[in-house]
């Protein structure tokens, strides 16, 4: 193949007339961007010479690192362990390893999960709502100092739940809820239920479900209100507009008796 990996997570194509097309390692003295189909650019490598890894190791010993890493293979749906040697950030050698580090395997499965290769059955709507509620209150009430559920936090929770596993089918049936619950102390979960509840009481009726936004703010940085889907005639029972988190008004999504949207009401 003419495709080559470059440093800084870049890639390029070796010139077709190059005589080092079969070399595992090479150095190109000319790198340029050219126009390609579809108004795209292409990185072309010219004037390339084959090199050996031992030369690089002798010249730049301090820039060579070797790490044991785990990667998820979507084919067999399992974790593979490798010993990877890098020159700075560029991978120059990879060897299979029989021994798998439990924490590294859990992290690799967690990354695969976030890339939608599989989904744990226990990662249900309750967890998704916890994430939305927590992220919303982090923006609505930063003074309460809740720890947000950003991507890194979700990754850590999944990695802990998958620790020691090597197969996707193991991760699919794993119970991830305890790991997510440990994201913050139990007292803070109780505060979350108080300030950003799942439901809100309704006069002479069952509690109604609150809908938290996927993103707590809009493109201008303004906090997006929490929504309540309610039929218009049900609002006549209220004597005041509901609020949560002490001062944030709940936005009503008003519906007809047949659940067709009428309008929003703040």
What label would you give each PLM region?
Residues 1-36, 194-195, 207-231:
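Segments forming glycine/polar-rich beta-alpha architectures that bind adenosine-containing cofactors
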Residues 1-3, 8, 24-199, 242-266:
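Acidic, serine/threonine- and proline-rich low-complexity intrinsically disordered segments
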């Amino acid at each position: 193949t003419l495709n080559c990996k470059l440093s800084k997570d870049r890639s390029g194509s070796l010139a077709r007339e190059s005589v080092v097309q079969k070399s595992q390692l090479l150095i190109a003295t000319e790198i340029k961007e050219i126009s390609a189909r579809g108004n795209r650019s292409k990185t072309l490598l010219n004037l390339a010479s084959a090199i050996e890894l031992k030369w690089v190791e002798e010249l730049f010993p301090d820039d060579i690192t070797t790490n044991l890493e785990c990667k998820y293979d979507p084919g067999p749906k399992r974790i593979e362990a490798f010993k990877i040697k890098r020159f700075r950030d560029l991978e120059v050698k990879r060897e299979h390893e029989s021994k798998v580090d439990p924490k590294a395997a859990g992290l690799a499965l967690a990354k695969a999960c976030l890339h939608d290769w599989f989904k744990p059955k226990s990662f249900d709507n309750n967890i998704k709502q916890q994430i939305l509620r927590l992220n919303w209150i982090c923006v609505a009430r930063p003074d309460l100092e809740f720890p947000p559920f950003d991507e890194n936090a979700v990754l850590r929770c999944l990695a802990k739940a998958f620790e020691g596993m090597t197969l996707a089918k193991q991760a699919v049936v794993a119970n991830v809820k305890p790991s997510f619950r440990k994201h913050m102390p139990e007292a803070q979960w109780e505060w979350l239920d108080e300030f950003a509840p799942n439901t809100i009481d309704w006069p002479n009726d069952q509690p109604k479900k609150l809908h938290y936004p996927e993103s707590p703010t809009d493109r201008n940085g303004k906090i997006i209100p929490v929504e309540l889907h309610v039929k218009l005639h049900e609002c006549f029972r209220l004597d005041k507009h509901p609020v949560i988190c002490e001062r944030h008004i709940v936005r009503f999504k008003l519906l007809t008796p047949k659940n067709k949207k009428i309008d929003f009401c703040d």
